[in-house]
Amino acid sequence: MSAGGEHLKDEGQRYQVVAAGAIAGMVSRFCVAPLDVVKIRLQLQIHSLSDPLSHKNIRGPVYKGTISTLKAIFREEGITGLWKGNIPAELLYIFYGAIQFTTYRTVTQSLHTLPPPYRLPQPAESFVSGATAGGIGTFTTYPFDLLRTRFAAQGNDKIYPSLLTAIRSIHAHEGSRGFFRGVSAAVAQIVPYMGLFFATYESVRVPISSLHLPFGSGDATAGVIASVIAKTGVFPLDLVRKRLQVQGPTRSRYIHQNIPEYNGVLSTMKMVLRDGGVRGLYRGLTVSLIKAAPASAVTMWTYERVLKILKEINQEAIQ
């Protein structure tokens, strides 16, 4: 393995990076799918948990934390309810993982070729590469993200019986723009998130690797630390994105039937602040961090292992 900042950007051929990134995303997604459904349900819940009077006229369930929400979904919708939206989410993670790692590798290699007066410090180089990879990956795969949210927000009332039905319905009633509701919040969120994630990951990986943790868990630990730091900073934009993704003609048919009508990132943020205060912007943060830590750990651990296997296979083929 390369040391320091050379680690992610120069190991493996392009097809190996694409394959490793895609497999890492797929494995990670399946492992954390139930927590993702819980997070989305909590983010779309607009009533205050501390004010029982706000529950009086609501239409839909009242979720009060990660464990109770998991139990409620399992009780009301069965085990499959915890994996709602998993098909578009798997497609999202596969394509996003492949695009993200490929773009990161390409950008960092390009930056590394700059002459000495223009070379960026290692943390800045990782930040720029991570932000670019995140922005491009988010925009190109955003329709899958929107579909994942809408399926996860469904209760027993099947708004979209299948993925193909959902695509046809959104295109027919909302047009092509319907697939990109909230995309500005997503890009605004993911650019600093991925920049912070990769910069932190590259910074802490070397010190952690010197601890010689078992089973290659140094990469996983670095991924956890990087994810928690980055996720907390940009979480309000993630909540705004989810609220915007369920706008449109089906807004009142999701599990939370009282979702307000939102228009634009700033106005949505103002409405959330007005109705729930600063805490309203961080609804679902706890489960998001619980999800983000294992998701990032599994992603980075799987990526490193798969890439290593592919390189070994390639070496054996050459010999």
Curated annotation (Swiss-Prot):
The chain crosses the membrane at residues 17-35, 91-107, 127-147, 182-201, 221-237, 284-301. It is a multi-pass membrane protein. It is found in: Mitochondrion inner membrane. This is Mitochondrial thiamine pyrophosphate carrier 1. GO terms for cellular component: mitochondrial inner membrane. SUPFAM superfamilies: Mitochondrial carrier. Belongs to the mitochondrial carrier (TC 2.A.29) family. Gene3D superfamilies: Mitochondrial carrier domain. InterPro entries: Mit_carrier, Mitochondrial_sb/sol_carrier, Mt_carrier_dom_sf. Pfam families: Mito_carr. It comes from Coccidioides immitis (strain RS). GO terms for biological process: transmembrane transport. Mitochondrial transporter that mediates uptake of thiamine pyrophosphate (ThPP) into mitochondria. Its main location: mitochondrion. It comes from the Eukaryota. Keywords: Membrane, Mitochondrion, Mitochondrion inner membrane, Repeat, Transmembrane, Transmembrane helix, Transport. Solcar repeats lie at residues 12-110, 121-207, 214-309.
